[in-house]
Amino acid sequence: MNDLSTATPEQPPIVEVQDMRVTFGSQNVLRGVALSVPRGQSLAIIGESGCGKTVLLKTVIGLVRPTSGVVRFCGYNLAELSDRELTRQRVRFGYVFQNAALFDSLTVGQNVAFPLRQHKSESPSRIRELVLARLAEVGLPNSVISKKPAELSGGMRKRVALARALIMNPELMLYDEPTTGLDPIMSDVINELMLRTRNQHDVTSIIVTHDMRTAHKVADRVVMIYPVNRLEPDEPQLIFDGTPDELKACGDRRVLQFVRGEAGERLAEMHQASSDREPQS
């Protein structure tokens, strides 16, 4: 397996995570996570539901603060930034939430323009121009600008969310399950838009996904997170780090079962856990 986690001097990491741990109460979600993402890379984070993928994504933008360890963006230790400084850095991110997270009471145009109005001083005509340009970029006609999110299909809402994420010309794009709930064709449309976004805007991308088609098509690097509660005490939580082709050839049975969608041992574990809870006669 190639070591893709070490950035070269010519390509310093845009994101760097060092020995990070995240706990919520007594629940250990992330443990000893180390990750370095060079500029321009497209990284897919895969793993079972509840293993900590989205939590990791949120630590990258400072929405979740690690219990211990360090998260850096462009060299800044996010834990050391004030709220004002952190807000200033977040302008450099674009985030596409799993459910699109559009404001239901706002029109499409107002949703896409929201970051501009919060962080820039642009004229109404310039804002409209930028909004229409971003909508066109994701394949939406001008006519949607006055519609409310409830009037749109799931795929259209995802594209509006992408347009909003791009409106501030981010350096780093983060996608949380971007194809969840979409049919195969619309999922591929979103995959193509993510590829186009990376190529046209020269952005770094981090994609949390269960969709192996997305991981293979969009990413040039894949890491897999394994649930902490199913690891040995000293075992690393990132059980795979390599290219999509290396993922297909990986010999780790846990990785193969996930990639192939095979319940196998997981089903047996669930059955055993259920049996252990049954009252003794």
What are the roles of these predicted feature ranges?
Residues G69-N77:
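Conserved ABC transporter NBD signature motif
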Residues I61:
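Helix-to-loop junction immediately C-terminal to a conserved catalytic motif
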Residues M173-D176:
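Catalytic Walker B motif of ABC-type/P-loop ATPase nucleotide-binding domains
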Residues S105-F114:
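Short coil-to-helix segment of the ABC ATPase nucleotide-binding domain corresponding to the Q-loop/switch region
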Residues Y76-N77, P124-S143:
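Conserved ABC ATPase "signature" region
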Residues K148-L152, M156:
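Conserved ABC ATPase signature
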Residues N169:
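Conserved catalytic motifs of ABC-family nucleotide-binding domains
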